[in-house]
Amino acid sequence: MEKQRREESSFQQPPWIPQTPMKPFSPICPYTVEDQYHSSQLEERRFVGNKDMSGLDHLSFGDLLALANTASLIFSGQTPIPTRNTEVMQKGTEEVESLSSVSNNVAEQILKTPEKPKRKKHRPKVRREAKPKREPKPRAPRKSVVTDGQESKTPKRKYVRKKVEVSKDQDATPVESSAAVETSTRPKRLCRRVLDFEAENGENQTNGDIREAGEMESALQEKQLDSGNQELKDCLLSAPSTPKRKRSQGKRKGVQPKKNGSNLEEVDISMAQAAKRRQGPTCCDMNLSGIQYDEQCDYQKMHWLYSPNLQQGGMRYDAICSKVFSGQQHNYVSAFHATCYSSTSQLSANRVLTVEERREGIFQGRQESELNVLSDKIDTPIKKKTTGHARFRNLSSMNKLVEVPEHLTSGYCSKPQQNNKILVDTRVTVSKKKPTKSEKSQTKQKNLLPNLCRFPPSFTGLSPDELWKRRNSIETISELLRLLDINREHSETALVPYTMNSQIVLFGGGAGAIVPVTPVKKPRPRPKVDLDDETDRVWKLLLENINSEGVDGSDEQKAKWWEEERNVFRGRADSFIARMHLVQGDRRFTPWKGSVVDSVVGVFLTQNVSDHLSSSAFMSLASQFPVPFVPSSNFDAGTSSMPSIQITYLDSEETMSSPPDHNHSSVTLKNTQPDEEKDYVPSNETSRSSSEIAISAHESVDKTTDSKEYVDSDRKGSSVEVDKTDEKCRVLNLFPSEDSALTCQHSMVSDAPQNTERAGSSSEIDLEGEYRTSFMKLLQGVQVSLEDSNQVSPNMSPGDCSSEIKGFQSMKEPTKSSVDSSEPGCCSQQDGDVLSCQKPTLKEKGKKVLKEEKKAFDWDCLRREAQARAGIREKTRSTMDTVDWKAIRAADVKEVAETIKSRGMNHKLAERIQGFLDRLVNDHGSIDLEWLRDVPPDKAKEYLLSFNGLGLKSVECVRLLTLHHLAFPVDTNVGRIAVRLGWVPLQPLPESLQLHLLEMYPMLESIQKYLWPRLCKLDQKTLYELHYQMITFGKVFCTKSKPNCNACPMKGECRHFASAFASARLALPSTEKGMGTPDKNPLPLHLPEPFQREQGSEVVQHSEPAKKVTCCEPIIEEPASPEPETAEVSIADIEEAFFEDPEEIPTIRLNMDAFTSNLKKIMEHNKELQDGNMSSALVALTAETASLPMPKLKNISQLRTEHRVYELPDEHPLLAQLEKREPDDPCSYLLAIWTPGETADSIQPSVSTCIFQANGMLCDEETCFSCNSIKETRSQIVRGTILIPCRTAMRGSFPLNGTYFQVNEVFADHASSLNPINVPRELIWELPRRTVYFGTSVPTIFKGLSTEKIQACFWKGYVCVRGFDRKTRGPKPLIARLHFPASKLKGQQANLA
């Protein structure tokens, strides 16, 4: 209804065209910028009206029309007008001429035909063409009824389009007291519901001022309209105006006033409605009262030039725009040309003022520091977001965008009369169509670029002189430059065009200069393992239970396929072990001492670093927090506080205790029969469940070097007999030891123990179906409830700790279970029932479930059950801690981090280690994990994975090397070797990437997923040796970068070597200059043996079809290699070959054995030689020493330093003050002789000579190096450094069974390295000599060595990478005399230069 009233009222009178010139009066907005800037200081505003209407008699209708427009703009805000001085109103006398020209333009614009509006796509309307048009009926104005401070609103009227009807005979309708006069200068148009943002204008008023303003306004309007505006009724348009809906009083209560309390008048300009209809001249972009001022220079120097960088209230331009205009609207405000619709039909609730009132300074209260254009309202669409530009109903909200300092506006206000002409002009662009991408980008660029960079439309077509006059002055530009501050903007909210190439960053972590960013090089894609569905299925079954039914295949065909696959990998493992055994030495299983806690902390330290760094870090912990050393005599058989069964092993010092299940019965283990041939578990043979319980112990093994037998209990096993008066139990099934949870290693009792090999035996109790927990579901956080408490499900959740005992068959009545039923959360059942500790089921919520599940599960239930079943394990010499873990737990984390600082990541690892120890104390009451040896493998894996920082590889290392479970950890060395040898198939590589150019290898989890289903049937000893040989092979031969392929014993089967060899053949030969210079790359690849070459060519042929399919390369014809030409020997050469020169010295070839024996006889019978100086006599003890020159004591190279050392026997007098060598240590104590004249810091021997030596004499000065060297050479005493075997230095205890070290690794005694000991020559004269390779790490020592030298080093030599302090038992760096790294040598030479 309201729309209908507005439509009808707008057509009551035809538009009046003013014909007479207008008298001078101020424009719509006659106040200056300076007045706006100071308006916030006013605290009182009131309206001063002029009741004398005689001043309007001389005005024409056009003047009255303009005056009415001005009055309507003033009173539309419904706020009191403050009293101002009359200075500003006198500035508008020069505007009459411009307004007269405007009135003529208005007449022309009104008579034009309006354009048809564009129909909205989202809301189509049906046009009724055939319906007759209705004549508009004049209607009396309707007073708005105000109830409770709210104006009643008219209902919505149906939308009907009407054409313009002009009637000149209609009279003007008087304006009611509730609304001001509204005149219509446009044809009839549609009325739409609009939003009233009057609340924004109310921010300048307090709630009390707003209520008083409404009352004063209502009373004042009634009084003045009754008395003073009667003369205007005959002149104005008779079209009634629909009063604008007023905001309710309740909405005004939430308006926040400004601090200065000033009121802000509003002018409602319905620009959005005009933009929608696009009705020609009435909606054109024209400022009817100020368009003539657009071309003025001062108008174009307005303060919007400062808008990009100025702020108000802590908000930037961009932030305010995004806040005021919702959605993605692009608000483009142009300060040079805009629209201002002054149609009287769009003005509501207006009042009329006289010219005298205007001249008295009514508008002087408009001094604002912002762009207060005409109103404070912005119309933004709510129902639908648009990407077009926002429509401004009233532009005074742009006040928030600009803030102008007072001293900057003074330059523009130097001419008051000229500055009065300046009006704020705002362009509002309305998008008709959906903007394209190019338009969007252009709009964004316009919004980002400052207005200072744009030229107004009025500048186009002007001469250079005009442009020169209109440009900014030099003073203005200099002032702008002076005020320019890079810190003015907020960097967090700054909008800048982003391009990767022009990005800049702070160098040096924010403390350095701003430099262009260096784009990160995109890494090459990581290759992936070609996994089949069957492998993935078996992998999942193995995670749940190693003895699952489908592990060997779901049908006969799959079972046969798996048997063939496992036979292939068994052959590969045997072949690899055999070859590496010949080169890298004997690395079969020999037990080390150490606790489970040591190994868990050891895997923390070995993550992502080399072994020599991680081993040094653990040695530092043992040195800083040592355990009090207890002699071995104090470690007798461990006892338990409760009555227990003594399980005795032959030739063993260790005993275990278990609860009195069978009344103090004894268990005797019988010896196993030796088996010369290794036996593997067949794929069709029933293997032991992963939940079996095995009682075992570690024992010392007598090591020999001649025997190569493997004694195993795979086939025959060992029997367990339990003698008891009440009942007798026997073991139903004996299972192979390679699947046992814990393996017992024993020595065979023989008459010749030094000729025997290790014999394995185990005592096992079959407890099937226990702890069958899905490991995958633990990782995925899925909880599976138990189906039956008496039936163990393979999907048992980790919240259920159960064990099913059905391995014993009682000959008599069963006895009571030893499990204490009073333990919380545990229940005891007999005859195969489940011992369970059930926890409430958790909901599935991703990662959060994992944390809740770990907290909810009682891991101590595993310990209680293991101790109830196998007894409490006491600390023995074999299971004693290497480090005082209680002291580490109580120490400061910074102290622990400082101890392992050399390893790297010290702070993070120190926190993890202390967190691990804290959890052990909180969960179990003590730092002890020996009970984990009696826990089933699957449960042990789940428990270890629950610790923070332990992954699958780390857990598998602990299980295989410490707990002796069936596992095969895949680290970086194992994964790289498996890929290069072709054990793991890869998905097709990109065309440009070859196998030998791989920088990244597949994920280790995927490699293990492929290998483990094929290696799961191997025994534990084979898996241990295979793992140990592979990680050593990765350090010595198959390094990540520049592997030693020439010396590799596996190059005939290596795909990496085949790819590199094929690439080297196709490569162009190097230049002669390049051939003469030393190459930093590895040695050139030698041709393999004939059979190896065929295998390598097959690999290349297999890889070619894939390339032919995807790669199209030009055919390159390679010429055949020329055949070697046979040298023709001339007749003269043949004759000269048999010509003998009588003056030539003949070469005498001696029999060295006979020569040695004769030399010994001469020395024995000829006593005269012994009377002289024996040190200068030539003594040849063997044929080898007689035929070869004496080797040097020290051979220095860049990567390694070779030292000739003497091997000291255990009974040597030099070892009287040292610790006794461990019986299982394969290495001996060594003595490294110093070169005469050498010092601890000397790198190369001195070549200087003394002046006394020219006369055959030696000086007595102690500082003379040359003379002292000669004296030491002739003396009977030499200096030396003791080298300690690594196993003896660590007292046989180290994490992960000592796999950190090499089997032939020694440590240099730090004390004798600094101060060498004096050794008589007679004590070392007949000792065997060995070679020790000193270096920084094992890979650098063996880099570039031949196969023969590597083999000699492992079998007859030793390696040394660190020193050892015998007092603190901590690691030390090697002194310069033993080895000086090439990197430090280069730095030292550079410093000297």
From Swiss-Prot:
Gene that this polypeptide is encoded by: ROS1
Gene Ontology cellular-component annotations: nucleolus; nucleus
Protein name per the record: DNA glycosylase/AP lyase ROS1
Class of the enzyme per the UniProt entry, highest EC level: lyase
Compositionally biased spans, kind Basic residues: 117-126, 243-256
Record organism: Arabidopsis thaliana (Mouse-ear cress)
GO molecular function, one term: 4 iron, 4 sulfur cluster binding
Tissue specificity comment: Expressed ubiquitously in both vegetative and reproductive organs.
Pfam families (UniProt xref): Perm-CXXC, RRM_DME
Null mutant phenotype: Decreased response to UV-B radiation. No visible phenotype.
Co-factor(s): [4Fe-4S] cluster
